[in-house]
Curated annotation (Swiss-Prot):
It is found in: Plastid, Chloroplast thylakoid membrane. InterPro entries: PSII_PsbM (IPR007826), PSII_PsbM_sf (IPR037269). One of the components of the core complex of photosystem II (PSII). PSII is a light-driven water:plastoquinone oxidoreductase that uses light energy to abstract electrons from H(2)O, generating O(2) and a proton gradient subsequently used for ATP formation. It consists of a core antenna complex that captures photons, and an electron transfer chain that converts photonic excitation into a charge separation. This subunit is found at the monomer-monomer interface. It is a single-pass membrane protein. Pfam families: PsbM. The keyword Protein transport does not apply. Belongs to the PsbM family. Keywords: Chloroplast, Membrane, Photosynthesis, Photosystem II, Plastid, Reaction center, Thylakoid, Transmembrane, Transmembrane helix. This is Photosystem II reaction center protein M. It comes from Pelargonium hortorum. NCBIfam families: PS_II_psbM. The keyword Membrane applies. The lineage of its organism: Eukaryota, Viridiplantae, Streptophyta, Embryophyta, Tracheophyta.
């Protein structure tokens, strides 16, 4: 069913986009370790 495929793609993007965004922030935060310690 095409609807299921579209729903799967929408869900994947909905999960991957925020995850990638948080991952970038995490990497930048770890890179600047002097910010916390």
């Amino acid at each position: 069913m095409e609807v299921n495929i579209l729903a799967f793609i929408a869900t994947a993007l909905f999960i991957l986009v925020p995850t990638a965004f948080l991952l970038i922030i995490y990497v930048k935060t770890v890179g600047q370790s002097d910010s916390f310690e």
